[in-house]
Amino acid sequence: VLIIAVLFLTACQLTTAETSSRGKQKHRALRSTDKYSRMTKHCTPPEVGCLFAYECCSKICWRPRCYPS
């Protein structure tokens, strides 16, 4: 199941990169707004639950919680 999820996410990233490189960006304002909203998302503090390391401020997730760096 994990392998299938990784393959799916990789395919989505490749498709997005290919579309952007061809200049087929239809909603430029929406895309830039989305980019800035992603930049302002907050990370999960230590001792709080996580699933992946990128969620944690310290980038250290040992399930089920974030650890301080």
From Swiss-Prot:
Tissue and organ distribution: Expressed by the venom duct.
Key words, A-Z: Disulfide bond, Knottin, Secreted, Signal, Toxin
GO molecular function term, any single one: ion channel inhibitor activity
Lineage top rank: taxon: Eukaryota
InterPro entries: Conotoxin
Keyword Transport on entry: no
Residue spans crossing the bilayer: none
Positions of disulphide bridges: C43-C57, C50-C61, C56-C66
Signal sequence, start to end: 1-17
Chief place where the protein resides: secreted
Keyword Cytoplasm on entry: no
GO annotations of cellular component type: extracellular region
Propeptide segment residues: 18-40
Places the protein is found: Secreted
Family, per entry: Belongs to the conotoxin O1 superfamily.
Swiss-Prot/TrEMBL domain comment: The presence of a 'disulfide through disulfide knot' structurally defines this protein as a knottin. The cysteine framework is VI/VII (C-C-CC-C-C).
UniProt name for this protein: Conotoxin AbVIE
Species, as recorded: Conus abbreviatus (Abbreviated cone)
